[in-house]
């Protein structure tokens, strides 16, 4: 006898169990709106702000406003995690979008994949989900540079002498960084970072890499009055409802194309759908 399971409902229930919620973030309305726009279009985003401004809190809550996995996405994600040996003993199917947050000491092989028998790296384990790189300039520049091509192609090819392996890597990149080595520029009157140190700090990130990050948003420090407020902000469910509506509009727009959301558009689609004001 056949058993029918409404996987869409199952995935929806799983995302509602997410441990973090946007209502827990005090203030930062502009940054929250930027996160919503990024989630709606699948755009990469970088948060620039001082320590304690809530950059990591915001990033960890992005999966809670993303649409539930489709069955196709769930199977793709499950295959990758299974190949990497990352599936739990009691898990047969990935039902929530992955959130990967590697440490800044990670090697290039661990990030993009590799080894004698090529294994998926963090960018593939984040496929259909979120890759969070906290304190982006602390990563080795060479490690970040190998991520440029996968960001563009949404897949990574690992070549060996006798064969090559392709792993998908269509993820939403969320990055964060301080505005200066000391972390508090320009508000710190005793800023200890020299112009040379500031330039060296910013030079850790190449122009081509930053070009692949669609949204750059400044996150201001939250004043005590805002932190002390009892009123909660919008919940992740409320924000996700708007994200879902935006994704539905995009699905209709691109129904004849192999595109699901705005971030996947190429030059032809941009010319057709993005009528820029003069």
Please describe what each predicted stretch is:
Residues 1-46, 53, 159:
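Peripheral, non-AAA+ core regions of ATP-driven protein-machinery
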Residues 49, 113, 135:
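The Walker A (P-loop) glycine that initiates the GxxxxGKT/S ATP-binding motif of P-loop NTPases
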Residues 2-22, 87-101, 243, 256:
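Long, charged amphipathic helices and adjacent flexible linkers at domain junctions
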Residues 118, 141-146, 150-278:
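Basic, amphipathic alpha-helical bundle interface domains used for macromolecular binding and assembly
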Residues 36, 92-98, 108-131, 164:
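Conserved alpha-helical scaffold flanking the Walker A/P-loop in AAA+ ATPase domains
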Residues 3-6, 47, 70-72, 85-90, ...:
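Active-site phosphate-binding and catalytic loops of NTP-dependent enzymes
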Residues 128, 134-136, 146:
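Walker B catalytic acidic pair
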Residues 46-88, 153:
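Walker A/P-loop
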